[in-house]
């Protein structure tokens, strides 16, 4: 539509968009946006469904229950002080958990929600990483695998720092890629910030940051611009050293060295293929999941040799370097006396692993075969993630269900449990006292409940004693034996309250945990030294 008229001594002819054409352009822009981004929206929605729909399906385990019982306090300062004495993790996640608990409380959904949101947010970050490497196809595959991988889903439903660790490390990797491509001051600052957040979330972030820093330092084109960012990361790492030293006084990592190294090394690929609890599925399922990955990598590597793609190849090398640092450095440190190699601590290194798989499997020239193999990997991951929700033996031990079975007992009662059952039982049974029965003391009780784990990960629980089910003290008889998933409880009762010593209770605890077992006392029980 034309508009004409005089402006001063000039006659002006101008073009004005017709309102109808403006209205027509708006749907076109929306349609263009949807066509471009609907795959990412769909994959992110799938990630949200897998994480949020069953957020409180599983019981808290020891570490999750320990946080609201002993770490979180009304005061943030008191919480941080407790972190320095009882935890083996930097403080960032606990600051978020403290803020979350002030608003939403300390229930399962409330404390797990930050992890779920972090897991969901990692999906678009994975998309961006894949896009930086090799375009939209690699972006879609990378985001899809992160969305449905059972290991990432598991830690997105755990009230611990791991999901936030994955997110911050993935953000640091993305910022590294963009800073390396265009080394502006702002992009280097973003890399320094996200890398610092990763270090403040989990100490194992250092093993991922080291190869990132070395990559920038060895690249003449960006070295000078990267120096301030590298310096900032070094300062943050140095600032954490006093906290690391203070936390070494605890015993939170002693269990790692008791887990045979070979079993831990085997668990690293198993965790990625079938999830944290996927060992229960057996090696056949691991092989079935690994087959499309290996086939896709083989096909993609062949096409890489036939059709070189310098940018994508450089991205693959960078991702391999980051993943290698995150996995191999902790392994190398084991024979040097620094054995902190728990497979769960390597979870963030699985993001660059996923990026490598995504880029190589759909490398240019792999065609429909590459797409089919990528879809097969995603479907296998999805099936296992759903299977965890449907199969109790793949879930965390059901201390919530066991506590429900124990409710309504007499006030004169003690409960014996493996060490890893003490915090969950106290969380779900608030009537239990806040302390264990001390060595050399006795307690007047009419019921003794002995709990244990029938079957679970060997590195976490001990087997039952052969004498399990026999009365632990004179005058008591077996009232009932109950099973809740992999957990079992023997309930022994006496017609009248009897004084029972701590030594007697510990001798007859149904697991072979010895000193690591706990004797929990009901708040109404009478103790004597």
Predicted feature residues:
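Membrane-proximal helix-loop-helix interfaces that form the catalytic/acceptor-binding platform
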Residues: 12-15, 35-528
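Short, intrinsically disordered terminal tails adjacent to the first/last structured region
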Residues: 1-33, 377-378, 526-529
């Amino acid at each position: 539509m034309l508009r004409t008229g005089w402006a001063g001594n000039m006659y002006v002819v101008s073009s004005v968009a017709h309102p109808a054409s403006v209205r027509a352009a708006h749907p076109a822009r929306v349609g263009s946006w949807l066509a471009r981004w609907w795959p990412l929206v769909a994959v992110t929605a799938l990630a949200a469904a897998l994480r949020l729909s069953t957020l409180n399906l599983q019981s808290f385990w020891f570490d999750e229950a320990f946080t609201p019982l002993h770490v979180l306090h009304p005061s943030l300062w008191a919480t941080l002080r407790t972190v320095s004495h009882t935890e083996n993790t930097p403080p960032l996640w606990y600051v978020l958990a403290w803020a979350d608990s002030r608003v939403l409380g300390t229930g399962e959904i409330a404390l797990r929600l930050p992890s779920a949101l972090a897991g969901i947010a990692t999906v678009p970050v994975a998309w961006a990483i894949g896009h930086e490497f090799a375009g939209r196809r690699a972006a879609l595959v990378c985001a899809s695998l992160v969305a449905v991988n059972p290991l990432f889903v598991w830690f997105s439903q755990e009230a611990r720092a791991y999901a936030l660790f994955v997110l911050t490390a993935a953000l640091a990797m993305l910022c590294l890629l963009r800073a390396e491509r265009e080394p502006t001051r702002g992009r280097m600052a973003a890399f320094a910030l996200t890398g610092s957040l990763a270090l403040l979330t989990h100490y194992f972030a250092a093993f991922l940051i080291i190869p990132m820093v070395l990559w920038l330092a060895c690249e003449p084109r960006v070295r000078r611009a990267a120096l301030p960012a590298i310096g900032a990361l070094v300062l943050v790492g140095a600032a954490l050293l006093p906290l690391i030293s203070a936390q070494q006084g605890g015993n939170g990592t002693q269990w790692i060295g008791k887990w045979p190294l070979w079993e831990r090394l085997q668990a690293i690929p198993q965790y990625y293929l079938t999830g944290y609890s996927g060992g229960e599925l057996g090696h056949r399922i691991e092989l079935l999941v690994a087959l499309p990955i290996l086939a896709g990598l083989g096909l993609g590597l062949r096409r890489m040799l036939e059709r070189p793609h310098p940018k994508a190849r450089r991205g693959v090398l960078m991702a391999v370097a980051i993943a290698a640092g995150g996995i191999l450095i902790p392994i190398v440190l084991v024979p040097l006396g620094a054995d902190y190699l728990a497979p769960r601590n390597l979870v963030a290194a699985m993001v660059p692993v996923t990026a490598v798989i995504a880029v190589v499997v759909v490398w240019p020239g792999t065609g429909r075969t590459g797409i089919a193999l990528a879809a097969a990997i995603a479907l296998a991951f999805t099936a296992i993630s759903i299977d965890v929700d449907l199969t109790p033996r793949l879930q965390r031990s059901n201390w919530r269900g066991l506590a429900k079975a124990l409710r309504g007992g007499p006030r004169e009662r003690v409960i014996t449990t493996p060490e890893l059952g003490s915090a969950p039982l106290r969380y779900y049974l608030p009537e239990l006292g806040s302390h264990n029965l001390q060595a050399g003391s006795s307690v007047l009780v009419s019921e003794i409940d002995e709990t244990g784990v029938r079957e679970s990960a060997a590195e976490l629980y001990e087997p039952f004693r052969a004498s399990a089910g026999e009365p632990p003290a004179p005058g008591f008889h077996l009232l009932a034996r109950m099973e809740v998933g992999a957990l079992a409880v023997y309930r022994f009762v006496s017609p009248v309250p009897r004084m029972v010593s701590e030594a007697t209770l510990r001798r007859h605890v149904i697991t072979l945990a010895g000193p690591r077992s706990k004797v929990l006392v009901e708040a109404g029980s009478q103790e004597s030294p």
